[in-house]
């Protein structure tokens, strides 16, 4: 616990008074600040908080809210232009930036550390250091970054981790970093071996650490990601499969998720190095000393989604006492196989819980597009538009998916409507909460399950881009789905505009096994010429999870490398999760993890679980009322509760305040007309209670969790 940690300046003063004093002539054994051996390609920049800054890339609150992204002066974007756009895109991808949704009033750059909305732009002056973590081979090249605000308090030093969400690049945790910057904390980021910039195999160009592009030959070991093909293999691949792209998460061959905890811990180590280089005391020879250490610096591991899972992994794997506490939102955590925990809601036992992401996502990939046509979901966001787009007689791809599942014996109902209801029931039986059903149509329309299933199957299998696992590849396509060359304007900006997991920023999933020629997955046809949204590809991916052949064993072996233990080593932790989450369902992640942690740690467990009603995974979708009407009237911003969890953890570690008890926070939807919901108020988002009323209390015992309705 960080309370009573001795301030580094006091330690320095004590050391000065005890070393070399009294004329003893004794030699002083200085504790020099040593650069971690894995750091490569280190570079630093300073930002004045006026023309440019750490948090908003010089855009300020207003610029981040502007629907028009920053421009580029020429066809070859500069590193600074890419940085600014990456901050803009990633912030808006993770946060609702509409005023009606709370931006600028309840959260956002201009809302200070005490939650007060100011009239300023919220820009943060400071320094930014960025480097690779690698063994010198250039094959790993995980990006690490440390932002140190000028307001960093040397007397109360703190570090917050903000590991990237999803498969995003280094700025993919910037909304979490915002909390730390406002507190005067250093923020430790890592892309955890993922990232948005691809290897363009046809052009043989790659991105450098700053997003600018060059040839793979010139980049050498400085490439953020190189697919690692020999010249002969690259030529053969391009000849047989032209115009394809390789992405780091899918195609690095590293199974990066197994090291997400390590990458986060290395980001913290990098932060200590940067702090000591900048603020540490100096030896008589001018060398920086290890003034800031885990013993005197408060460190909170945080972030959301995959970044939240990385924070939990880091806390489990922390052998040096680097991390004091954890505060995360909707973490993706892979439970042990056959964890044997019990999850209850409202007194009813959840039959299926604790499955890994690749398992439940390949199940969603099979059934979600069909389930989205269920009549019981007709009033949910995007359901009507989904039916028009994907069940129209001219393009009945979702209805054909239902029929294809029936033909395979995976559904039994006779009509499309009944098949859709059956598909929905199968998802609910597989661990999705009933409230999650309202999100199936929009997630299916955005091809969320296929994108995750393809990337993670490749990653866990350590597949090469050459393997084209289950017949999938990545490419830019035309309006009718034909593979085409990726325009330089797309490739050169993907570092900023992409999310690292196609479909993204114009790059699509391609079905290389489509009848005739490879075509965009959505438009592809089976051997009989029927468009089924590539049911065969979905079944292939599913077989890697459930099968026993060599390909399945490879994936399953990689999956086992990513499973968590539940042992947070007694560290205090707060997990916040939206009950309605349809991407990372609570029954497979946060709920069973809390039960596992209590079984592993027993009375030493200090984990609080906060489940938020009317909250789901994609806050940014709330800010798209014209595209996704109904998100605004149904859902509140979960990001606000991550901020509150961080507030509570900081108060616990620094001031000794008790952690909030595990509970359900009952929010109030904005209501009104979908697409034009009234502005959110504080009444919609009640605080996390220090001690909830009995009806809201979550009971966690050894291997079991009971959540009230």
Curated annotation (Swiss-Prot):
| Reactions the enzyme catalyzes | (3R)-hydroxybutanoate dimer + H2O = 2 (R)-3-hydroxybutanoate + H(+)
Note down the stretches annotated as region Disordered. Answer: 58-77
- Record carries keyword Hydrolase: yes
The biological processes this protein is annotated with in GO are: butyrate metabolic process
Q: Could you tell me where this protein is found in the cell?
A: Secreted
Q: Which UniProt keywords apply?
A: Hydrolase, Secreted, Signal
Please tell me where this protein is predominantly located: secreted
**What EC number(s) does the entry state?**
3.1.1.22
* GO terms under cellular component: extracellular space
- A single MF term (Gene Ontology): hydroxybutyrate-dimer hydrolase activity
Highest taxon listed in the record's lineage: Bacteria
Query: According to its UniProt record, which residues of this chain constitute the active site?
Result: 305
Per the record, the pathway is: Lipid metabolism; butanoate metabolism
Residues that span the membrane, as ranges: none
- The leader peptide range reads 1-26
Decide whether keyword Secreted is in the record. yes
| Biological role stated in the UniProt entry | Participates in the degradation of poly-3-hydroxybutyrate (PHB). It works downstream of poly(3-hydroxybutyrate) depolymerase, hydrolyzing D(-)-3-hydroxybutyrate oligomers of various length (3HB-oligomers) into 3HB-monomers.
Q: Which protein family is it in?
A: Belongs to the D-(-)-3-hydroxybutyrate oligomer hydrolase family.
- What protein is this chain from? D-(-)-3-hydroxybutyrate oligomer hydrolase
Q: Can you name the source organism?
A: Paracidovorax citrulli (strain AAC00-1) (Acidovorax citrulli)
């Amino acid at each position: 616990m960080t309370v009573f940690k001795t301030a580094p300046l006091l330690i320095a003063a004590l050391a000065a008074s005890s070393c070399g004093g009294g004329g003893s002539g004794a030699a002083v054994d200085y504790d020099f600040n040593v650069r971690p051996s894995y750091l490569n390609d280190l570079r630093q920049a300073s930002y004045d908080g006026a023309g440019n800054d750490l948090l908003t890339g010089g855009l300020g609150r207003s610029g981040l809210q502007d629907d028009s992204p920053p421009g580029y002066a020429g066809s070859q974007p500069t590193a600074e232009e890419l940085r600014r756009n990456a901050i803009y895109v990633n912030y808006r991808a993770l946060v609702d930036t509409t005023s009606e949704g709370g931006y600028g009033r309840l959260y956002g750059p201009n809302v200070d550390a005490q939650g007060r909305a100011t009239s300023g732009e919220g820009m943060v002056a400071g320094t930014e250091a960025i480097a690779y973590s690698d063994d010198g081979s250039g094959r790993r090249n995980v990006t690490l970054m440390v932002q140190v605000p000028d307001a960093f308090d040397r007397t109360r030093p703190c570090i917050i981790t903000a590991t990237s969400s999803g498969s995003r690049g280094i700025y993919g945790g910037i909304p979490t970093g915002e909390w730390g910057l406002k507190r005067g904390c250093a923020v430790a980021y890592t892309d955890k071996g993922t990232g948005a910039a691809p290897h363009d195999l046809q052009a043989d160009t790659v991105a450098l650490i700053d997003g600018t592009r060059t040839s793979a030959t010139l980049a050498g070991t400085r490439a953020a990601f190189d697919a690692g093909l020999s010249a002969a293999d690259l030529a053969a691949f391009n000849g047989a499969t032209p115009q394809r792209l390789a992405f780091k998460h899918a195609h690095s061959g590293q199974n990066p998720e197994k090291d997400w905890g390590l990458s986060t811990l290395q980001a913290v180590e990098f932060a200590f190095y940067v702090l000591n280089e900048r603020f540490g005391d100096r030896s008589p020879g001018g060398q920086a000393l290890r003034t800031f250490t885990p013993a005197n610096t408060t460190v909170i591991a945080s972030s959301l989604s995959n970044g939240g899972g990385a924070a939990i992994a880091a806390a489990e794997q922390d052998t040096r006492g680097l991390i004091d506490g954890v505060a995360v939102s909707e973490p993706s955590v892979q439970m042990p196989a056959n964890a044997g925990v019990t999850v209850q809601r409202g007194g009813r036992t959840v039959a299926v819980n604790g499955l890994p992401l690749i398992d439940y996502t390949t199940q969603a990939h099979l059934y979600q597009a069909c389930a989205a046509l269920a009549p019981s979901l007709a009033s949910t966001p995007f359901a009507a538009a989904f039916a028009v787009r994907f069940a129209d007689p001219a393009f009945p791809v979702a209805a054909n998916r239902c029929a294809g599942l029936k033909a395979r014996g995976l559904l039994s109902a006779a009509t499309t409507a009944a098949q859709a209801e059956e598909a929905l029931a199968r998802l609910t039986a597989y661990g999705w909460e009933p409230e999650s059903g309202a999100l199936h149509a929009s997630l299916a329309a955005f091809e969320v399950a296929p994108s995750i299933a393809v990337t993670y199957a490749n990653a866990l299998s350590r597949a090469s881009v050459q393997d084209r696992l289950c017949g999938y590849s990545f490419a830019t396509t035309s309006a009718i789905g034909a593979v085409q060359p990726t325009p330089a304007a797309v490739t050169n900006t993907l570092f900023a505009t992409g999310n690292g997991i196609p479909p993204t920023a114009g790059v699509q999933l391609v079905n290389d096994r489509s009848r005739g020629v490879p075509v965009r997955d959505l438009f592809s046809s089976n051997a009989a010429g029927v468009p089924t949204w590539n049911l065969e590809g979905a079944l292939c991916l599913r077989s890697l999870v459930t099968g026993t052949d060599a390909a399945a064993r490879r994936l399953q072996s990689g999956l086992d490398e990513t499973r968590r233990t539940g042992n947070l080593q007694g560290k205090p932790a707060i997990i916040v999760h939206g009950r309605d989450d349809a991407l990372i369902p609570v029954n497979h992640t946060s709920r069973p993890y809390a039960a596992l942690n209590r079984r592993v740690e027993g009375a030493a467990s200090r984990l609080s679980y906060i489940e938020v009603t009317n909250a789901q995974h994609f806050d940014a979708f709330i800010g798209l009322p014209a595209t996704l009407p109904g998100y605004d009237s149904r859902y509140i911003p979960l990001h606000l509760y991550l901020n509150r969890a961080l507030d509570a953890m900081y108060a616990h570690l620094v001031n000794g305040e008790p952690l909030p008890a595990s509970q359900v926070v009952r929010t109030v939807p904005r209501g009104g007309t979908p697409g034009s919901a009234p502005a959110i108020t504080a009444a919609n988002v009640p605080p996390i209670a220090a001690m909830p009323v009995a009806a809201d209390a979550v009971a966690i015992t050894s291997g079991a969790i009971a959540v009230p309705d």
